[in-house]
Amino acid sequence: MKVLLLGTGDAIGTPKIGCDCPQCRHAQETGTGRLRTSLLIEEGGRHILVDTSPDLRQQLLRAGSPHIDAVLWTHGHYDHFMGFGEFYRVQKCPPVYAAEPVLRYCGGTFRFLEFEHHPVEPYVPFDLFGIRITPFLVRHPPAYTCGFVFEAHGSRVGYTSDTNRDIPEKSLDLLKDLDLLLLDALVPSHTRIVKHMNYLDACTLAESLHPKEFRCIHVSHVMPWEYPHLAEDGNVFEYV
């Protein structure tokens, strides 16, 4: 199982349009910005795309234009699903897996694009291409939001998507002792946002869950680049 981070940024991305902060200047000068958060999971030549960001065309071209065998949506915020329109005239009827409220909301936006609807239930595992996938609930008010745990070859990877600190205990149980934990960490530790975790929240949670590896995703342009544990676009993790 190969996990490729297509994007690690927040809804705005880095650099932010019109911003001259140190992080955005660094991104412009070095070409190391952050596209909107999304990941690509490969197993046995099949590809699962987790969230379809507005940067999807650029992300898939960078990844070598893989055929997408399944799409997973976490929730109905535009930076996590609006790029789905990039499948138009590229790939017919892609299969999409998501919780019923998410399928209903996101699917209503893409009436011009036919796709397979596959509702999934939180905490009910399903299998795709040799990967066991378990959706779990997180708290990202007011959006109904799920994360996913991916398991193959005895390795487990957890992806929270967007969430605040109040993750249900049943979900936390699934996230213990992972090989890789990908956690929302939108802003530095001194900033508090109701529907997201900050850097300290993410690091504290990761410490309590004991993953072998931990990375912060969904990172905003105000996060200093030098902080430890920050994921970067193009990071790859392989489990065989």
Question: Where in this protein do the model-derived segments appear?
Answer:
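Conserved beta-strand hairpin/beta-sheet module of binuclear metal-dependent hydrolase folds
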Residues: 1-59, 144-161, 180
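Active-site metal-binding loops of divalent metal-dependent hydrolases
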Residues: 8-9, 52-54, 76, 138-140, ...
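Glycine/Thr-rich phosphate-binding loops of Rossmann-like dinucleotide-binding domains
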Residues: 13, 58, 81-82, 106, ...
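Short, hydrophobic beta-strand segments that form beta-sheet elements in well-ordered domains
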Residues: 47-51, 71, 95-99, 117, ...
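Short loop/helix-cap segments at secondary-structure boundaries that form the rim of catalytic
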Residues: 63, 87, 106-110, 126-128, ...
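Metallo-beta-lactamase
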Residues: 93-146, 152-153, 231-233, 237
